[in-house]
């Protein structure tokens, strides 16, 4: 995601540099939508690719951690249809889905506002384009930041699926925990969750029930099994 975002910022800079050559404000406005459509499509494609990779890599790496399982191949078995359905839902709902769907409209709106402000201030076209560039880079950064935290959640969901597949093959239940970031950005809900998970871990259903209890107390919008809510640096792990 980070490399794709850097590449797109470079593309944005080049596209806007060409706009410095236009002669009228009307011509400048007509180019905004085309640039926004191009950037939105490329951002969406990069995000979808990263979501798919994060889920599948989480699944295969979690399954591969399990020792003593009768593995018939060097890699994890193929995803089950229900796993693929979970991945499909993760791609079509939630904060990241909303963010990349709104990206194009927000970009068009803010770039047009920048043009109108520049006209009102009597700015030259190159000056307006410079301000448009900052808007585009800023919006790309915001979407990348949302994607970073949401894709962590998707990787956790993949890990959960890998662990559950191994549980089924071995006929036993594992214990799990959450590695939760501990700094000033950690919300009270996660602080409480961290303090209530025993060092020996918890069976999955018990961990889910604890998350639901804490989430309800703090009025969190729970999504998925492995995170309390998306805006935390939290990873699902199996306790050995």
What residue ranges belong to the model's regions?
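Activation/maturation switch segments at domain boundaries
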Residues: 1-50, 149-240
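N-terminal leader/targeting and assembly helices and adjacent pre-domain segments
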Residues: 1-137, 239-240
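Residue-level detector of solvent-exposed, low-hydrophobicity positions
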Residues: 62, 66, 70, 104-110, ...
């Amino acid at each position: 995601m980070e490399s794709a975002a850097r590449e797109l910022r470079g593309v944005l800079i080049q596209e806007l540099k060409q706009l410095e050559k236009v002669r009228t404000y009307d011509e400048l406005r007509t180019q905004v939508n085309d640039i926004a459509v191009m950037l939105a499509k490329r951002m969406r494609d990069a995000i979808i690719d990263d979501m798919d990779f994060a889920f599948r890599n989480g699944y295969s790496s979690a399954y591969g951690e399990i020792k003593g399982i009768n593995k018939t191949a060097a890699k994890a078995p193929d995803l089950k249809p229900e796993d693929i359905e979970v991945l499909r839902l993760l791609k079509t709902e939630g904060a990241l889905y909303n963010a990349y769907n709104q990206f194009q409209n927000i970009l068009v709106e803010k770039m047009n506002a920048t043009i109108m402000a520049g006209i009102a201030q009597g700015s030259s076209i190159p000056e307006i384009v410079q301000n448009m560039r900052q808007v585009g880079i800023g919006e790309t950064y915001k979407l990348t930041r949302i994607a970073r935290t949401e894709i962590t959640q998707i990787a956790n969901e993949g890990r959960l699926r890998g662990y559950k597949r191994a549980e089924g093959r071995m006929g036993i239940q594992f214990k799990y925990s959450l590695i939760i970031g501990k700094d000033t950005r950690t919300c009270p809900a996660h602080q409480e969750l961290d303090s209530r998970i025993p060092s020996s871990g918890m069976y999955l259903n018990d961990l889910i029930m604890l998350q639901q209890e804490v989430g309800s107390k703090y009025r969190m919008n729970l999504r998925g099994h492995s995170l309390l809510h998306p805006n935390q640096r939290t990873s699902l792990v199996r306790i050995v």
